[in-house]
Amino acid sequence: AYREQIGAEPRNRGKSVDDMLLVDEMKRGMAQGNASGKHLIILHTKGSHFNYTQRYPRSFAQWKPECVGVDNKCSKAELINSYDNSVTYVDHFIVSVLDQLRDKKAIVFYAADHGESINEREHLHGTPRKMAPPEQFRVPMMVWMSDKYLENPDHAAAFAHLQQQAAMKVPRRHVELYDTIMGCLGYTSPDGGINENNNWCRWKK
């Protein structure tokens, strides 16, 4: 469901319509049905998409002055302040998600869909690949595994492999996420549905 639909639910009256609503929905989803069974939960966030100032509550307005109003009236410094505030709120959101999963066997993937170019009185993304500056397509990705998940030796070895790749700054791509999610969970596909070459968790025993 869209966050606007979630925000319209009677249980959410008076709450800000932002990404934190998804954390409560995640908790509800895990509690429904077979609470001890397997769950695949996908949270589609607004993150740090423009309008940046609308992505976080006032309590997260750490850097000021902010960009308020239309972006072509905002200075580069104001745009960056609002963007940085939104990133801080994304961090808060991610920690809140992880806090719900620390006592469970869980693995979490996070990926931004694109970056932003911020200039004086303008912000840009979606520039054609051959022309795009690095900040638009080199985006953060994260893989987190709970302590309970890491009790499995194979999971621990896969996570160590991920950490090694991160330390070596091995470049990764969005197109590899499906194969990685399935591979890290231990699924294989003999008919080629899962490309092991794209599996970040792949390691040799």
Where are these regions (language model features)?
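A short beta-strand-to-alpha-helix junction
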Residues: 77-90, 129-139, 150-181, 189-196
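A short acidic (Asp/Glu
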Residues: 52-56, 99, 119-123
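Active-site-proximal alpha/beta segments of enzymes that process anionic O-linked groups
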Residues: 1-68, 173-204
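Short glycine/proline- and charge-enriched loop/turn segments
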Residues: 2-10, 122-128, 157-163
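Histidine-centered active-site microenvironments of extracellular/periplasmic hydrolases
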Residues: 106, 111-154, 194, 203
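A long, amphipathic alpha-helix that forms part
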Residues: 24-31, 66-110, 137, 142-144, ...
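Catalytic glutamate of the conserved HExxH
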Residues: 45, 89-93, 110, 114, ...
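Flexible internal linker/loop segments at domain or repeat junctions
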Residues: 57-78, 148-160
